[in-house]
Amino acid sequence: MFIDSVKITLASGDGGKGAVSFRREKHVPLGGPDGGDGGNGGDIIFVCDNNTHTLVNFKGKRELRAQNGAGGMGRNKNGKKGENLELIVPEGTQVIDAQTNEILLDLTEEGQRELFLKGGKGGLGNTHFKHATNQRPDYAQPGIKGESRLVRLELKLIADVGLVGFPNVGKSTLISVVSNAKPEIANYEFTTLTPKLGLVDVNEYNSFVMADIPGIIEGASGGKGLGLAFLKHIERTSFLLFVLDPMRQMPLKEQFIVLRKELEKFSNELFGRKFGIMISKSDSVRLGEEFAEQIALNINELDNYLKEINNPQSFLIKVSSLEKTGLKELKFMLLEEIKTLRNNKKNFNNLGSVLY
């Protein structure tokens, strides 16, 4: 089951209370204080793990708490620290304050560990309060309460390439033939109800991650269809591949315009992201000469529109996932784009290090 949003209360452990205790030995009727300190409460720690792909482990849980610290004991024995609670989450998980919507943590890298809530400090035992005017203190500190916070965990998939298109345009078929992903494929809209990630091996040394996002429809940015729930997953893809279907009644140019508008309404940053265009189902030209001519005009109209708007797209390619034509070229084109983006990011990070 794919779960990408949960609301939950997280609480670190309370500190254990300090002990009130006195030495009890033969021939020492009024032994001094020997109360130990309480143990600190356990912490809440988030751990990012790329073997985890969903937030399903948090489904149905209203609260998770770290262990409380144990109380102090006599003979100056300190209480045991409460066990930390480590929460394993997938890459791309954000921890958001449920009241203010403030992003508290952003977990994006394998192995990333973040202390979220610190456990309460254990109280001091009565040994600490002995002084010249009070040799037998009969009080100790209570432990400090742990922290508690109501949060929302949101998963935004991280991928190199995100597939953007209307329902049933061939996105799932494409990712099934170029990667290790096995999405459900059928001839009806909204076959893909959850995002899918696939690893695309281009050659022995190069690969990238592709995300199949459920189909976008007009009005998605306002919540129509599967709407906002899945548009957010495109946010963390480095490169967008628009998948357009020549078999739809809507012309290719109009498909592209509508999809771009939905992205623009959702996020200006996403709208400005670099992208390519893939015309799917190129084998449909076999349906007849007249149909093939219509598709050619359709593609030409799209191409002219892109030139009119000085479009920054990197490439336009025709592909048939069923006949496996154009797939090799597509993979290499995408790889070149990803390499360029990775190098640009690396150079930017290096520049930042030098400036710092």
Swiss-Prot record:
Domain of life: Bacteria
PROSITE patterns: G_OBG, GTP1_OBG, OBG
EC supergroup of this enzyme: hydrolase
InterPro entries linked: G_OBG, GTP-bd, GTP-bd_Obg/CgtA, GTP1-OBG_CS, GTP1_OBG_dom, GTP1_OBG_dom_sf, OBG_GTPase, P-loop_NTPase
Residue ranges annotated for the Obg domain, each copy included: 1-158
EC number: 3.6.5.-
GO MF term set: GTP binding; GTPase activity; magnesium ion binding
Keywords associated with the record: Cytoplasm, GTP-binding, Hydrolase, Magnesium, Metal-binding, Nucleotide-binding
Any one of the GO BP annotations: ribosome biogenesis
Required cofactor names: Mg(2+)
CDD domains: Obg (cd01898)
Sequence ranges assigned to domain OBG-type G in this UniProt record: 159-339
PANTHER family: DEVELOPMENTALLY REGULATED GTP-BINDING PROTEIN-RELATED (PTHR11702), MITOCHONDRIAL RIBOSOME-ASSOCIATED GTPASE 2 (PTHR11702:SF31)
Function: An essential GTPase which binds GTP, GDP and possibly (p)ppGpp with moderate affinity, with high nucleotide exchange rates and a fairly low GTP hydrolysis rate. Plays a role in control of the cell cycle, stress response, ribosome biogenesis and in those bacteria that undergo differentiation, in morphogenesis control.
Entry's family note: Belongs to the TRAFAC class OBG-HflX-like GTPase superfamily. OBG GTPase family.
Oligomeric form and interacting partners: Monomer.
Official protein name in the record: GTPase Obg
Encoding gene, per UniProt annotation: obg
